[in-house]
Amino acid sequence: SGGIRPSIIRASGVAEGGKTSCALAFARNFQATVDNSMAIYIKSEGRLSADMIARSGVDTSPDKWFVYKSNIFESVLQLMRDLITDNPTNCKYFFIIDSMDAMVPKKDMDRSFEDADKVAGGSVLSSNFLKKMALGLATRWHICFMISQVRSKVSVNMYEKTDPKLTNASGGNA
């Protein structure tokens, strides 16, 4: 099944490090080798372009490829659950989430930036995702390729009158 077994795979790396290209290569192989298969690209942050899709060789026919644009954690989770549980044709799915770090809980969408969950937010969402999806994906023979960014530079405005330990700057390896 595309060189990898049904499971959840996480690829982490720097921006422009080839994670999306790698995921698309696996998706192409999955489409070519698994009968009744479909690749679902969940675009929450990634820079997926028509050129990138063309270079990857992914089959973009409607019964083999779908792009879902959302960065709301709950809507992505619901889409995936619906596809794998209400699946009368027994289609095998290769999900690409690009990227997990761009996911936002619905409750944070209505909050101010200062009130939103910050510390290790991406790690908490990934953990919740794994708890809810790992067993269902693996036992029904689906694959999820989660892409994560490594943002190792955390910068703080030295002129701001706040405690530098309480930053809301992006970055870090939480």
Model-identified regions with their sequence ranges:
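A short beta-strand-to-loop transition that corresponds to the Sensor-1 phosphate-sensing loop
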Residues: 43-45, 99-100, 146-152
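Phosphate-binding/switch region of NTP-binding enzymes
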Residues: 119-174
